[in-house]
Regions:
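Ligand-site clamp/hinge motif
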Residues: 210-256, 385, 394
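Surface-exposed binding/hinge segments that line
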Residues: 94, 128-175
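Aromatic- and charge-enriched surface segment that lines or borders ligand/interaction sites
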Residues: 80-125, 143, 149, 236-239, ...
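Gly/Pro-rich hinge or "lid" segments in bacterial periplasmic/extracellular proteins
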Residues: 67-69, 164-218, 222, 231-232, ...
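A structural "hinge/loop" feature
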Residues: 37-54, 78-80, 105, 130, ...
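Detector for C-terminal structural segments
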Residues: 50-51, 199, 203, 208, ...
Length: 526
């Protein structure tokens, strides 16, 4: 029987999957799955890509995690229970007893403190992409080995969900004391699988951790993440050489796999907390001129692009800074008022040409840096270049493999002109999605390099606002300024399509390709 899953009510966490009877998990077997890119290093705290989280996440635990069957509900991971004070300023966690690291050492509250100290105030030379998420933490206390207390400077609307971030791998305090950069080159966590090997350009292997704290888990004896992409990856899925690819497929690949696999295929799909954004290097002329950036955003027909691209790529939805359909996102009526979101593309492009002329850039040409990942970077990149051509702009398309692509944007003094960046998160939350638009000195994922204290102040206001209506109003102020200044600008939001073999059980799709990848609950029905 062919199975389908549609998670359309994200805010309500709709997770109904009809026609599937409950089954008892069976232990054993090795799961082989595909990953279409390779991690640049091994440090969770510095990474943002699926290429890292899919092979590496099974080695680690986090303080809390999402219950994928009830997403976006949260449950304990290393935390057994927790309490939030009435004033919202103190978070107390009781930790699991008897948890071991893979080297046999005992886990304690000191490891949580060391991990979050590294996240919120990284030592020199250590990169913490999510430092801004923990800027409101004033102190971390460890009254005993199984209790950790976070004290906040002010209320934060997203703090509890921050603690469920799949990126906040818990590291050994002892290892971090010896070398703060230990996680960049070494894998050593408390997760369901121990590290076996990473063969560059080939595969990543994990083995069942016999000392895992959850009795009976993981069910798998191990896993192999095979680095393969494009047509070879789809062929491997069709042939059963791999059972899954956890990021997402194009509609065409989905249709081909369903046709080939027949009743062996399971299809799961959902809107995606992920978008591609065009980032302009504001330290480089002419992209230091707001008129040029705004003109290039105005030239993009997002509405027509979404209709055309959804047939060939894993993008579908038109939205602003927040995922369309999310209750804090702009309405369609509000969107249409923003520059670049009008449905009158002829008027928008006329304005774009005038802005370029006023800036002395009527004959603008530049290099557009992109990632050589077919879905959806290449088709969206080609689409954007065609859009800019229609206002007389000449663009060279530079496509780089993941490591070089990330390095081109993340270096201290980037030399790129403009780049197709991604803004993906583990859940709908402005405190996460808006970090890319903060000033460069406040956000490690701002590659546009701008400083904008107006946006910084608006971010802080919405972050601490617990009244949803008031927060919504502040978010519209933020969005209006961000899209008018056009440091980075969103293009089209993604739609996640997963096809996997029905023999793989226990995996639930969520609106984030970062969530649910520890593989502790996955089992094989052979």
């Amino acid at each position: 029987m062919k199975l389908s899953r549609f998670l359309l009510g994200l805010a309500a966490g709709a997770t109904a999957l009809t026609g599937i009877a409950a089954q008892t998990p069976v232990s054993g077997g090795v799961l082989k799955f595909a990953v279409s890119a390779e991690p640049p290093n091994y440090d969770c705290h510095a990474q943002t890509s699926f290429a890292f989280i899919h092979p590496v996440r099974p080695h680690y635990n986090t303080l809390l995690k999402f219950d994928t069957a009830k997403y976006p509900a949260i449950k304990g991971d290393l935390a057994e229970s927790w309490n939030v004070a009435k004033d919202g300023l103190t978070y107390t966690f009781k930790l699991r007893k008897g948890v071991k690291f893979h080297d046999g050492s005992t886990f304690s509250s000191q490891d949580i403190k060391a991990t979050y100290d590294r996240l919120r105030a990284p030592p020199a030379g250590v990169r913490s992409v999510r430092q801004a998420s923990y800027a409101d933490v004033a102190s971390i206390e460890t009254p005993d080995p199984l209790t950790v207390v976070f004290k906040l400077k002010k209320q934060n609307a997203s703090m509890l969900t921050n603690f469920a971030s799949p990126w906040d791998c818990v590291y050994s305090a002892a290892k971090l004391k010896q070398d703060p950069k230990f996680p960049e080159r070494n894998i050593m966590g408390t997760g369901p699988f121990t590290f076996v090997q990473h063969v560059a350009g080939s595969q990543w292997t994990g083995r069942k951790f016999e000392g895992y704290f959850e009795k009976g888990k993981p069910y798998l004896n191990g896993y192999v993440a095979i680095f393969i992409s494009g047509a070879p990856m789809v062929n491997a899925l069709a042939a059963g050489e791999v059972l899954a690819e956890f990021r997402g497929h194009s509609p065409a690949d989905r249709d081909r796999l369903v046709k080939t696999l027949g009743d062996k295929a399971v299809v799961q799909e959902t809107p995606w907390v992920c978008s591609l954004v065009v980032t302009f290097n504001t330290r480089k002329k002419p992209f230091d001129d707001q008129r040029v950036r705004k003109a290039l955003s105005l030239a993009i027909d997002r509405w027509a692009g979404a209709q055309a691209l959804q047939k060939i790529a894993l993008v579908r939805h038109v939205g602003g800074l927040l995922r369309p359909g999310y209750d804090l996102a702009a309405s369609a009526k509000e969107l249409a008022q923003y520059p670049g979101w009008s449905k009158n593309i002829n008027a928008s492009r006329a304005e774009a040409k005038k802005l370029l002329a006023d800036a002395g850039q009527s004959n603008l040409s530049f290099t557009f840096t992109n990632r050589n990942v077919a879905m959806p970077y290449v088709p969206v990149g080609v689409f954007l270049i065609d859009q800019w051509r229609q206002i007389g702009v000449n663009v060279k398309h530079e496509q780089l493999e993941t490591r070089l692509y990330l390095a081109a944007q993340q270096r201290d003094n980037p030399t790129f002109d403009a780049a197709l960046d991604f803004n993906c998160d583990f859940m709908d939350e402005p405190n996460l999605q808006l970090q890319k638009y903060l000033s460069h000195d406040r956000s490690a994922i701002n590659y546009a390099q701008q400083t904008d204290r107006v946006l910084d102040d608006l971010f802080d206001k919405q972050s601490g606002e617990l009244d949803k209506k008031k927060r919504y109003a502040i978010l519209r102020e933020f969005e209006k300024r961000a899209l008018d200044q056009a440091y980075p600008v969103p293009t089209i939001w993604w739609h996640r399509l997963i096809v996997h073999h029905k023999s793989m059980k226990g995996w639930h799709i969520t609106p984030s390709h970062y969530v649910g990848q520890d593989l502790a609950d996955v089992w094989l029905d052979r």
